[in-house]
Amino acid sequence: MSNIEIAIAVVVVMTLVGLMFGLVLAFANKKFAIEINPLIHIVEDILPKGQCGACGFAGCMAYAEAVVINPDVAPNLCVPGKAPVAKMVAELTGKAAAAVEPKVAFVKCAGDLSKAVRSFEYKGVQDCVAASLLQGGPKGCQYGCLGFGTCVKNCPFDAMTMSDTGLPIIDDDKCTGCGKCKSVCPKQVIELVPLGIHVAVNCNSKDKGAVARKLCSVSCIGCGLCLKNCTHGAIKIENSLAVVDSAICISECNESTCLAKCPTGAITTYIKAVPKQA
């Protein structure tokens, strides 16, 4: 038997074996196939497809499957979709949709390149997580934004850009409040705040006043003037940092007296009002 004949025989045998396995797999696929509820795909189609995981599930498909199959999974967990998506999911699944409070990301740091002290010059990987592993990062303030844009790179909705001053800028019209940027920030500088809040503290420092002021010219120094001048009790001092109670600030405040009293300008007016529901 020549080499050519042997080669042909091998090809024929392998083809027959492959064909046999193909038939077996096709039969098994048809015999043991699990039917997927078509409603799952319908729900998935109305989700924003950001795959942000803010709902607590591993992507939009996973949430769609869970909300359709599991009666305990709420229809309003899609943060980017907000109230309109929650309403549609509720109608499709026959569940009650609770109100969704619209939120957007807010960077609690104003310490840009001109205002914050640098401890050293960083020449490593341009990533906030990587930079934070080296003595906490090059910024003197160990609580401030490092400015390498890890949040920008991870925003699934292109709602963030890096400014020339070394701080991220958030496009409030594009931001869905999914929290992806917050989850990747090693300094926990980004916070999700409700729309409609009147003021926000543009600082994340927990350092004492003298230290904070030395490291950044616009840091909160925990002096308490904002607290004393807030007539609604919406501000408190925690770990040398002013903290605003958003619920009180939204419902009670009509004039932000705390803004004028802040000696460093760490308290800032906020973004925009809550959009009217259709």
Where do the PLM segments sit?
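Strongly charged, low-complexity linkers/loops
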Residues: 225, 235-243
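Cys/His-clustered metal-coordination modules, chiefly Zn-binding fingers
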Residues: 207-208, 241, 245
